[in-house]
Regions:
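Ligand-binding "clamshell"
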Residues: 1-4, 119-131, 193-196
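Extracytoplasmic ligand-binding site segments that recognize negatively charged/polar headgroups
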Residues: 1-106
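Solvent-exposed loop/turn segments at secondary-structure junctions
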Residues: 14-15, 23-25, 44, 52-56, ...
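Sec-exported extracytoplasmic/periplasmic mature domains
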Residues: 39-43, 60-65, 83, 87, ...
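Periplasmic-binding protein-like
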Residues: 76-85, 123-147
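Conserved C-terminal helix/tail region of periplasmic/extracytoplasmic solute-binding proteins
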Residues: 100, 204-238
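A ligand-binding cleft/hinge motif common to bilobed small-molecule-binding domains
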Residues: 103, 109-126
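Mature extracytoplasmic/periplasmic domains
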Residues: 141, 146-207
């Protein structure tokens, strides 16, 4: 829905690296980008996100490819990159538990959504958020009304409620994800706001190497199958 003809965004952001400033050298992040997840210095001290889409995005971007590639060769290279990571780095593959775990400083770094990183940084000032120069995923969460909705008028009212200032403010301030309401975004990130100075709350925009996912069912199936094999490799790693 490139023109937002059928959907209304309520959150937006990026996927990047959350890191403990006391354990991770910023020079390593700047030099390696996503390759830091294969840096032996951080072996056993990283989180990967249990999402085939985000994990393959990371690998493809580390290799210099588009995250929307359908090339069998490039997807195979990304698969091999991830297998190398899980076999040598002993990552912990997690989902939402990364939020509290990183807020408590349990590992040095992890792959994370910007909204979750903003929450982590608000809870722990020793945490930072880094976006590699190779680019990343620029995403949005949106609401749609199905064509066969039984009460479209009420659905529109709900969308208006979530999108207006009060609803959008409460939603964004509670979870840490960046609001699609410009006024709310400016308030929360600005002076005196709950996320003042927290870079993860203000997503990078206009960067040419950042991409929005383009849905491809065949590629989705391929990546899902390969990610299952990556997790098997992780479980068999010594």
């Amino acid at each position: 829905d490139p023109n937002n003809d059928y959907s209304i965004p309520y959150f937006w952001g990026t996927v990047g690296i959350v890191y403990d400033k006391n354990q991770v050298d910023i020079e390593d992040l700047e030099r390696e980008g996503f390759e830091i997840f294969r840096d032996p210095k951080y072996r056993g001290n990283i989180y990967l996100y249990d999402s085939e889409r985000d994990s393959f995005m990371m690998a493809l971007k580390a290799l210099g490819y588009s995250m929307n590639t359908s090339s069998e060769k490039e997807l195979q290279e990304a698969y091999e990159w991830l297998v190398s990571c899980v076999q040598t780095m002993k990552p912990e593959i997690v989902t939402d538990e990364i939020i509290d775990n990183m807020a408590q400083g349990r590992k040095a770094l992890g792959l994370i959504y910007s909204g979750d990183a903003a929450y982590v940084m608000a809870e722990n000032e020793d945490m930072g958020y880094y976006l590699p120069e190779s680019g990343t995923n620029l995403w949005s969460d949106a609401m749609v009304i199905p064509a066969n909705a039984k009460n479209p008028e009420l659905a529109h009212e709900f969308i208006n409620f979530v999108s207006d200032y009060e609803g959008a403010y409460d939603n964004s301030s509670f979870v840490g994800y960046t609001s699609a309401n410009q006024e709310v975004m400016d308030t929360l990130y600005g002076e005196g706001g709950e996320y003042e100075g927290i870079d993860a709350y203000m997503p990078r925009s206009g960067y040419p190497k950042d991409e929005v996912f383009e849905y491809n069912e065949d590629t989705r199936k391929t990546i899902a199958n390969l990610w299952s094999k990556v997790k098997i490799a992780a479980s068999n790693a010594e």
